Regions:
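Hydrophobic positions on the alpha1 helix immediately C-terminal to the Walker A/P-loop
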Residues: 255
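Conserved internal helical-beta-strand scaffold that buttresses enzyme catalytic cores
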Residues: 2-250, 260-413
Length: 413
């Protein structure tokens, strides 16, 4: 709980708007999270998987019309269209507040309002930022507890500061027509309605860590980038850190968790992962470029992840992971997805919740955008500097893409 006046004022506004039956403050303790996991299983929001083969792992299915980020319903709401930038969708802030509040009004009736205090970046880092998300989804709470630093320590770090990001998520009716993911940079506010899919509702991820953070960075003199961060150690023990910018589904996670080829391994080269998706970049006091990973976990695409393509990622998913929209193997209560192995289960439930036989079905069992949410600490090659408050110094930046034609990815640097 907090005594921060700006937080309490906003929470009072949210309570009056959403009309919840109960309010629960997420303190991040294992006992509270375990109670929520049990409740999610009781309500059918999650399924507990085989404790021997996948300890602490769960399966969740979204609605079939709610399986990915909705770029066409994602808006930057700034006073002028020019401020939103040429690559974003723009809406008038006043009009959108009115529309969104009308959609969200009383949507928590009979439900619990979960209040999640979270830190993007290590708590106490001068480069970290704090957010507070209210949600009516246990799935969101449990994913945020993996993807960010959550709990009482965040309140202590925030103190009485008014510098924090407001996040409202409401599942509402999951209407596609009334689904909106809106950002109000001038107000430090994010509002997401009528979705329950991770990328739209885990408001610390793209919404905060890239979109709102880009505005904050422009204002404060730093960068929020869609980049992985990895460290490479040579045989002499010298470590160099590299950032790499690729669009989604271009292999950032695979590169971030790279195992050096045998030739280099034998020579003593090692690779360490600091992040697979987002980097916050600052100029340090020494004039070098420094980076932190604002996230605390991996929200990876499951299909195609296997022992050959990314053994470190596969190992990362073996414990304390939430799987979304993959196949449920009923024979041993585990999960499967296309590209995992050749042993597609015959007695299974697909991502839509339908009976599925992988040996004969022409339909894919897992959604192409099915996901795993895993703690960063699970990764076998996670860097010992992952929680470094000042981040790590960047020596090089790689740019990549999947454009068919040959074209320079960098024209000027």
């Amino acid at each position: 709980m907090t005594e921060n006046k700006s937080v309490l004022k906003w929470l009072d506004e949210m309570k009056n708007l959403l009309n919840p039956s109960e309010i629960m403050f997420i303190n991040g303790t294992e006992s509270q999270l375990e109670n929520l996991r049990k409740l999610a299983c009781e309500t059918g929001e999650m399924i507990k998987l085989n404790e021997e083969k996948l300890p602490g792992c769960y399966l969740h299915r979204t609605a079939v019309n709610d399986v990915a980020r909705v770029e066409d319903k994602t808006y930057i709401c700034t006073p002028t269209k020019e401020e939103a930038g040429p690559t974003n969708n723009w809406k008038n802030p006043e009009e959108m507040y009115e529309l969104l509040y009308d959609i969200a009004r009383n949507s928590y009736t009979g439900k619990t309002m979960y209040v999640i205090p979270y830190s993007m970046g290590p708590i106490g880092s001068p480069f970290s930022k704090i957010g507070i998300e209210v949600t009516d989804s246990i799935y969101v709470v449990l994913n945020m507890a993996i993807m960010t630093r959550v709990g009482e320590k965040v309140w202590h770090a925030l103190g009485q500061s008014e510098d924090w990001i407001r996040g409202l998520h409401a599942k509402c009716t999951l209407s596609e027509e009334k689904r909106y993911i809106c950002h109000f940079p001038q107000d430090n506010t994010i509002i997401s309605v009528n979705s329950a899919y991770g990328g739209n509702v885990l408001l610390g991820k793209k919404c905060f860590a890239l979109r709102i953070a880009s505005y904050l960075g422009q204002k404060e003199g730093w960068l929020a980038e869609h980049m992985l961060i990895l460290g490479v150690k040579n045989p002499a023990g010298e470590m160099k850190y590299i950032a790499a910018a690729f669009p989604s589904a271009c292999g950032k996670t695979n590169l971030a968790m790279l195992i050096p080829p045998e030739f280099y391994r034998k020579k003593g080269y090692k690779v360490y992962c600091l992040g697979d998706d987002i980097a916050w970049l600052h100029i340090g006091k020494d004039g070098r470029l420094w980076a932190i990973n604002p996230e605390n976990g991996f929200f990876g695409v499951a299909p195609g992840t296997n022992e050959k393509s990314n053994p470190n990622a596969l190992q990362t998913t073996k414990t304390a992971t939430i799987f979304t929209n993959v196949v449920h193997n009923l024979d041993d209560n585990t999960v499967w997805w296309e590209g995992l192995d050749e042993n597609s289960p015959e007695n299974a439930i697909n991502w839509k919740g339908e009976r599925w036989n992988g040996r004969v079905s022409s339909e894919k069992g897992a959604h192409p955008n099915s996901r795993f949410t895993s703690p960063a600490k699970n990764c076998p090659c996670i860097s010992s500097h992952f929680d470094e408050l000042n981040g790590v110094p960047i020596s090089a930046i790689i740019f990549g893409g999947r454009r068919a034609q040959t074209i320079p990815l960098v024209y000027q640097a």
